Amino acid sequence: MCQRLCDDFQRAGADCQCIHGDIRQSQREKTMQQYRDGKLAILIATDVASRGIDVDDVDCVINFDVPAENEYYVHRIGRTGRAKRKGVAYSIIGNFPEKAKLDEIAKFSNYQIKTMVLGADGSLTEEEVKVPAPPKRRFR
């Protein structure tokens, strides 16, 4: 998934590289140095490969999953907005258990998490996402 996403970005003309477990450590280190030096606009990393990344100037983090641990999520998005800079984090979720987890993280971290809906045309709109009520049981 990580490599495929990177390939898609590159085909679209984006200056992008990725790091994941199938890439040699020497190549990961080279890619990280390019990113730190500002020679690379977009870095895509798997969860495991991203651990230990220390980069000061990150404008945006996009999460394709929600970590199980609240602290890890806060650490992951904390890469944005360091040194009084502004940053933004997006989390792409596709089911209500992940939405509930984001709500839990918002309470834990005291962050405001805005919910937006991705339309079929690629547009983002602010809409309240309502969790469907559980079916009512009938007792006889």
For the regions a protein language model found, what residue spans apply to each?
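Conserved helicase RecA-like core
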Residues: 1-131, 135-140
